[in-house]
């Protein structure tokens, strides 16, 4: 029995060495300061700065509770990802872990679903940039697609720079986002604490009871809203991808992940609670940042414009992060055969430029959407982005569970940074993600149509697999086979034939 366990551990170690070879070519240039801010900035994006306006209209004060629920499960997902990162840091993130624990088919599905997430998220971000620019009346007559194309050009160029420059830019982008929220929290708390009226109206808890209570539209709209709020946390897993280019991921990643949970509570829940205590929830509008709405009503010259510049930066930051992620995820998939061979190419600056360019091509579709249906593009694309992130998070949880199993069986070394309450919290998180899919079906028409598109996505994934499986088989013919990996055996047999 001991001999079998030792043999299984040796096979698993051999596969890890093969997977680690996929990381060659990256420049380990990210420091602790940058990783910390990337983790924080990943949790603060367009979903809060722009999406919160429409969400307050739909759920009222209950939005704070929705953010809290989603935030707790986001923390579980981050801790699960942290386990995987300490097991084996990888720029391929959970796609590489899916390849290790679930096989190449799972890595193929995980990778392309994550690509769907970031492809859709990028379209949301360039749409957000265009909407923010229309805040200024001077640009009111400029078509939305022009700003979308401009944002795409700027960020696409930035992503071709080396990772050190990306990390530094993302640090400052994230810092601006954090400072914006902190300034709002300080100014809003002063107004609330001193009892100063805002636009002639008193602030305080009465604004909740005077405007329909905590659930002004009932419980069901608040529950359905969970599927939209999930998008607000869609970048938290960025820290997993960044771990592959960290100087010391074993120390940096746990510290960064543990800092996220209380910041989610402060920035998301605290901000929404403060927003509804300062103004009636129905004073906020879809299409305009609620923070811009608040500062504009202070009567201070240019404060609304300054805040609008901040949230514009947030959208560009999210777009920048998306291109960073997809370039590396597509390269990881290409190394395993699940994506075209050219996507594995690296530039002299150690940047996976081919994957980034492929993503930019998809983002151009977003520019056309801004031209064709500018008023609906944000909500249409938001649902598809949520679908992609739900699938990605589910793969993270399943891989974490398989890692625990491998550790228990002696195939992998134990890790010091673990998901609290696992496996209960692992199963609970998977149940939560499944419930989000169910809730999406009730969000008619966009959510309903998104769920209805699942069979089409499944057909496309199956068709795509038949297109790549020969290359996958060729690559896996020389890859180590773990004791429990029947898929690799099948792939090798296919390659032999």
List where the protein language model places each region.
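Extracellular loop-to-transmembrane helix junctions
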Residues: 26-30, 50-147, 157, 260-263, ...
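TM-loop-TM module centered on a large, flexible mid-protein loop between adjacent transmembrane helices
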Residues: 96-98, 103, 135-139, 208-212, ...
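Membrane-interface "cap" regions at the ends of multi-pass membrane proteins
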Residues: 1-53, 57-62, 75, 79, ...
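Membrane-interface loop-to-helix entry segments
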Residues: 144-202, 234, 257-261, 382-395, ...
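Hydrophobic, membrane-embedded alpha-helices of multi-pass small-molecule transporters
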Residues: 30-49, 151-154, 208-269, 274-275, ...
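A generic transmembrane alpha-helix motif of multi-pass inner-membrane proteins
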Residues: 380, 384-392, 419-497
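C-terminal membrane-solvent junction of multi-pass transporters and transport-like membrane proteins
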Residues: 343-353, 393-444
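Hydrophobic alpha-helical segments and their helix-loop junctions in multi-pass secondary transporters
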Residues: 176-210, 273-279, 393-410, 467-472
């Amino acid at each position: 029995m001991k001999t079998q366990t030792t043999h299984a551990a040796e096979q698993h170690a051999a596969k890890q060495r093969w997977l680690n070879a996929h990381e060659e070519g990256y420049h380990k240039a990210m420091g602790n300061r940058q990783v910390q801010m990337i983790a924080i900035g990943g949790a603060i994006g367009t979903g809060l700065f722009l999406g919160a306006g429409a969400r307050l209209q739909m759920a009222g004060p209950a939005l704070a509770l929705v953010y809290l629920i989603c935030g707790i499960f986001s923390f579980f997902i981050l801790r699960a990802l942290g386990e995987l990162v300490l097991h084996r840091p990888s720029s391929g993130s959970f796609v590489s872990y899916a390849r290790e624990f679930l096989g190449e088919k799972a890595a193929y599905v995980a990778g392309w679903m994550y690509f769907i997430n970031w492809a859709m998220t990028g379209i949301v971000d360039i749409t957000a940039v265009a909407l923010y620019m229309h805040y200024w009346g001077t640009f009111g007559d400029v078509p939305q697609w022009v700003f979308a194309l401009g944002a795409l050009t700027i960020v696409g160029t930035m992503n071709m720079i080396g990772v050190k420059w990306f990390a530094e830019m993302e640090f400052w982008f994230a810092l601006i986002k954090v400072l914006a929220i902190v300034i709002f929290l300080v100014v809003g708390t002063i107004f609330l604490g001193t009892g100063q009226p805002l636009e002639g109206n008193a602030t305080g808890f009465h604004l909740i009871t005077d405007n329909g209570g905590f659930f002004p539209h009932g419980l069901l709209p608040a529950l359905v809203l969970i599927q939209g709020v999930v998008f607000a946390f869609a970048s938290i897993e960025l820290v997993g991808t960044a771990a592959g280019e960290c100087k010391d991921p074993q120390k940096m990643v746990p510290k960064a992940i543990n800092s996220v949970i209380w910041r989610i509570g402060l920035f998301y829940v605290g901000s929404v609670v403060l927003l509804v205590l300062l103004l009636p929830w129905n004073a906020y509008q879809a299409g305009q940042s609620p923070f811009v709405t608040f500062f504009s009503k202070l009567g201070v010259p240019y404060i609304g414009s300054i805040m609008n510049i901040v949230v514009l930066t947030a959208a560009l930051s999210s777009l920048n992060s998306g291109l960073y992620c997809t370039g590396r995820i597509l390269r990881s998939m290409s190394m395993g055969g699940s994506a075209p061979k050219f996507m594995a190419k690296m530039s002299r600056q150690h940047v996976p430029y081919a994957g980034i360019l492929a993503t930019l091509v998809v983002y151009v579709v977003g520019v056309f959407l801004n031209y064709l249906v500018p008023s609906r593009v944000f909500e249409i694309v938001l649902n598809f982005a949520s679908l992609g992130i739900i699938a990605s998070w589910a793969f993270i949880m399943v891989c974490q569970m398989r890692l625990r199993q491998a550790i228990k069986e002696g195939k992998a070394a134990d890790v010091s940074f673990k998901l609290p309450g696992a496996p209960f919290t692992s199963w609970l998180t998977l149940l939560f993600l499944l419930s989000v899919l169910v809730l999406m079906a009730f969000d008619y028409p966009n959510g309903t149509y998104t769920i209805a598109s699942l069979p089409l996505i499944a057909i496309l994934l199956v068709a795509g697999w038949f297109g790549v499986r020969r290359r996958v088989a060729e690559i896996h013919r020389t890859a180590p086979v773990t004791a429990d990996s029947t898929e690799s055996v099948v792939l090798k047999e296919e390659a032999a034939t």
